Regions:
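The feature captures the beta-strand-to-loop junction immediately N-terminal to the Walker
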Residues: 57-59
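Conserved ABC ATPase "signature" region
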Residues: 26-27, 121-138
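Conserved ABC ATPase "signature" C-loop
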Residues: 220-221
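Pre-NBD coupling/linker segments of ABC/ABC-like ATPases
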Residues: 2-40
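A short, surface-exposed alpha-helical micro-motif characterized by mixed small hydrophobic
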Residues: 208-210
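H-loop/switch region of ABC-family ATPase nucleotide-binding domains
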Residues: 202-203
Length: 226
């Protein structure tokens, strides 16, 4: 049985830099060879085995976030193939997807349901999510009354407690105050130890070394070290 849970095969991602919307529309029906291009990923190949914890490092614009967005289905390759086996939780845009008029607790059910969890399973983890977010009485107040930090705490808590097969993290450890960041860090390490596959983008080499057992170094859309 194959242990590969993530596979990138000759993956290329091109962003076309149009001058305006009119030009973008005109090129829907003809070749884009004359349009200025930004190659975010250039024929990337790598495999991730179940249970691996991988740090993805590189300068801004190296292609790190593009890889994470492909794993989470936010964007797709221009060429090549990406294969994902298992459910994915993403600590990317932690505050995205909340309904402002719904309470924090109601949003727990909504966001968890959208990840594919059953109502019974959500009930099982509800207390864990509430306790980890540590929002007190605000958990039953509308999200519109939350600060951005409170929304990020709740978003982190939901994604970290659904126990995914694959956890994708993009600098999420900057959430909240020092004590909450420490709690987040410890939770991620416990998930790694339990066998969750983790892909972690960070500018902190110390965090990568503590969490990850493998590092992929990207430069200008290419893997230069794995």
């Amino acid at each position: 049985m194959c242990d590969n849970i993530i596979k990138f095969e000759n993956v290329k991602k091109i962003y076309y830099l149009y001058k305006n919307e009119k030009e973008q529309f005109s090129y829907l029906f003809k070749s884009k060879k004359n349009i200025k291009q930004h190659i975010a990923l250039n024929n990337i190949n790598f495999l991730v085995n179940k249970g691996e914890s991988i740090g993805i490092i590189g300068k801004n614009g190296a292609g790190k976030s593009t890889i994470l967005k492909m794993i989470t289905g936010v964007t797709f390759p221009t060429e090549g193939k990406v294969t994902i086996i298992g459910n994915v939780a993403a600590l990317l845009e932690l505050t995205a997807g909340f309904v402002p008029e719904m309470t924090g607790r109601e949003n727990i059910y909504l966001k968890s349901y959208l990840t594919g969890l059953s109502e019974d399973r959500i009930k099982e983890i509800e207390d864990d999510i509430v306790d980890f977010a540590d929002l007190g009485e605000y958990i039953d107040q509308p999200i519109r009354t939350y600060s951005s930090g409170m929304k990020a705490r709740l978003g982190f808590s939901i994604n970290i407690n659904i126990k995914p097969d694959i956890l994708v993290i993009d600098e999420a450890l900057s959430v909240g105050d020092a004590s909450f960041r420490k709690k987040c860090h410890e939770k991620i390490i416990s998930l790694v130890e339990s066998g969750v596959t983790v892909l972690y983008v960070s500018h902190s080499i110390d965090s990568v070394l503590e969490i990850c057992t493998r590092v992929i170094y990207l430069k200008k859309g290419n893997i230069v070290y794995d």
